[in-house]
């Protein structure tokens, strides 16, 4: 996964921890982890809109409390889609997942499984991460130029590229 793609000297210094928490508890859970382990100097949460009612409020709370946010609206597959050169205009998670599954299988020759621990490796092998970052950032900035401020109104869109870009900057030294 992402950790394995980091240069060896950074694999022990950048901590990537996946935690199960209810969406409403993500910020507090992240802050608790950061307080327990001092190496979490720059805490992030990553989550999808899906059917999260308090999507905007959770993002706002995180920012106010010093937690960075990588969000996807409607789902993480919109970010994955960008690896293959496009960010389609899906408005709901079901359509987004269904269409990404078809694209993924066409591009990789493999079945898409949401919980696949190798997804990052596969996206990088068959797709273009730098292109994905640019596509996602262009979409995000276009929504902002168009006057959209709330992440829930920015669909399809993601800010996961900010996390990936930050990791790349920290490890390309």
Positions of predicted regions on the chain:
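C-terminal accessory helical subdomains adjacent to catalytic cores in phosphodiester-
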Residues: 2-16, 30-44, 49-173
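Short, charge-patterned binding micro-sites
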Residues: 20-26
């Amino acid at each position: 996964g992402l950790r394995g793609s980091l240069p060896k000297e950074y694999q022990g210094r950048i901590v990537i921890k996946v935690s199960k928490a209810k969406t409403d508890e993500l910020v507090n859970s992240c802050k608790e982890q950061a307080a327990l382990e001092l190496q979490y100097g720059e805490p992030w949460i990553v989550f999808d809109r899906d059917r999260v009612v308090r999507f905007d409020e959770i993002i706002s709370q995180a920012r106010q409390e010093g937690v960075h946010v990588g969000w996807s609206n409607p789902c993480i597959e919109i970010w994955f889609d960008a690896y293959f050169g496009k960010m389609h205009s899906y408005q709901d998670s079901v359509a987004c997942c269904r269409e990404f599954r078809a694209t993924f299988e066409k591009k990789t020759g493999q079945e898409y499984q949401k919980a696949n621990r190798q997804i990052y490796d596969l996206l990088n092998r068959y797709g273009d991460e730098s292109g994905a970052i640019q596509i996602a950032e262009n979409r995000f900035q276009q929504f902002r130029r168009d006057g959209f401020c709330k992440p829930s109104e920015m669909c399809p869109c993601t800010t996961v590229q900010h996390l990936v870009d930050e990791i790349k900057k920290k490890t390309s030294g």
